[in-house]
């Protein structure tokens, strides 16, 4: 009798321990668009990506990997986080190379140009570091990155994010955001994010062919040159630096535009190509009144235009040809194309009706897209 009672108690204790472990496992991270995008990268088949795009929010709002695949047949993915600091790029290149051998790295350089007037976003702070390291699998690269950039007082929380996020009452709800992606085993929308909005571009500057420059902040230039030195030392010849389109509506943004031109001058000193789409936007008929949801990010209309244009450049000028993927991988990419087209139809209807929403690949969004007929 006592043995049976002890057995029941033991079972209850074990059940409680398992429940606590599962709860911590589900809620220890902050679930947002950055986590879902980075987690999606690790779900891609090893060494299957032709192109990896590295950068900040412009990378995942302005370019669609699924639509580039549909149009040109090559595979790609955005390894990008919000406000991604330049100082993390070396670690992120190492991380990408642990899983993929891309034919080309496309590196967006807003982080170097966007620092000015006493503000330097090229350096690392706790928020943007966690957007990256919280979502990395444990590895020597993660340990090295945490050791280099985190403070000693809270270092443990970088390995056990539950310490940081357990007090967020919405985190348990958010933990279901990734259920669908984890069930399918791959990302359907390939990391893109957008808003259902058109933002008028009143007073937007005409910068076509403007090559004027402004100096970078000293720390930004230092970080840029150190990263370029790293690329040369690692014999990374397959790197294309870019400046994705932004809308310039005031003098402060114009100075950032000029710093972007200066970034290009520095990059060219190291023998790398730099494509600046801020002063060549007429080539793909960019509409400042319809193709942006704010000055820094294109909406789905701009995204479709830019993906088609830039994808063609990658294929025609940089030799990124149709990918030789397996039939199983092709089915997955075809499904991504299907769901991205559903997304465009869904987001387009919300945008035209004035229903303002932030859109990224959550389980809830995918369930809504299940009921959308492809456009």
Question: Where on the chain are the PLM-derived regions?
Answer:
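N-terminal Lys/Arg-rich, disordered targeting/topogenic segments
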Residues: 1-8
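Alpha-helical transmembrane signal-anchor/signal-peptide segments
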Residues: 29-49
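C-terminal regions of proteins
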Residues: 252-365
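Secreted/periplasmic serine-hydrolase-like ester/acetyl group-modifying domain
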Residues: 123-234, 323-375
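Extracytoplasmic/secreted proteins, especially bacterial periplasmic and envelope-associated proteins
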Residues: 63, 88-91, 150, 154, ...
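Hydrophobic membrane-insertion alpha-helices, especially the h-region
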Residues: 8-28
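Conserved, well-ordered alpha-helix/loop/beta-strand core segments that scaffold catalytic motifs
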Residues: 104-116, 178-282
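Membrane-embedded segments
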Residues: 54, 58-144
């Amino acid at each position: 009798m006592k043995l049976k009672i002890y057995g029941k108690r033991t079972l209850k204790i074990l059940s409680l321990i398992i429940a606590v472990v599962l709860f911590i496992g589900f809620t220890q991270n902050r679930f947002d668009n950055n986590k879902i995008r980075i987690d999606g990268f690790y779900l891609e088949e090893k060494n299957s990506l032709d192109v990896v795009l590295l950068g900040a929010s412009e990378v995942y709002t302005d370019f669609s990997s699924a639509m580039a695949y549909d149009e040109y047949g090559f595979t790609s993915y955005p390894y990008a986080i919000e406000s991604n600091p330049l100082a993390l790029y070396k670690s992120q290149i190492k991380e990408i190379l642990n899983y993929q051998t891309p034919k080309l790295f496309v590196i967006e350089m807003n982080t170097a140009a966007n620092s000015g007037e006493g503000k330097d976003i090229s350096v690392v702070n706790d928020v943007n570091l966690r957007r990256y390291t919280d979502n990395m699998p444990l590895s020597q690269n993660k340990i090295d990155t945490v050791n280099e950039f985190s403070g000693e007082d809270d270092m443990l929380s970088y390995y056990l994010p539950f310490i940081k996020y357990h007090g967020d009452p919405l985190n348990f709800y958010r933990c279901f955001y990734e259920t669908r992606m984890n069930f399918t085993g791959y990302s359907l929308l390939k990391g893109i994010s957008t808003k259902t909005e058109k933002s008028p571009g009143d007073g937007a500057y005409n910068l076509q062919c403007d090559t004027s420059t402004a100096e970078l902040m000293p720390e930004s230039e230092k970080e840029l040159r150190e990263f370029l030195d790293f690329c040369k030392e690692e014999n990374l010849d397959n790197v294309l630096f870019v400046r994705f389109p932004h809308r310039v509506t005031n003098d402060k943004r114009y100075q950032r535009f000029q710093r972007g031109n200066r970034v290009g001058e520095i990059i060219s000193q190291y023998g790398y190509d730099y494509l600046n789409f801020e002063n060549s936007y007429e080539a793909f008929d960019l509409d400042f009144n319809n193709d942006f949801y704010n000055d820094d990010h294109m909406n789905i209309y701009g995204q479709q235009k830019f993906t088609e244009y830039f994808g063609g450049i990658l294929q025609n000028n940089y030799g990124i040809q149709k990918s030789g993927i397996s039939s199983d991988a092709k089915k997955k990419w075809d499904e991504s194309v299907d769901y991205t087209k559903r997304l465009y139809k869904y987001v387009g209807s919300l945008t035209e009706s004035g229903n303002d929403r932030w859109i990224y690949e959550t389980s809830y969004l995918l369930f809504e897209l299940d009921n959308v007929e492809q456009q």
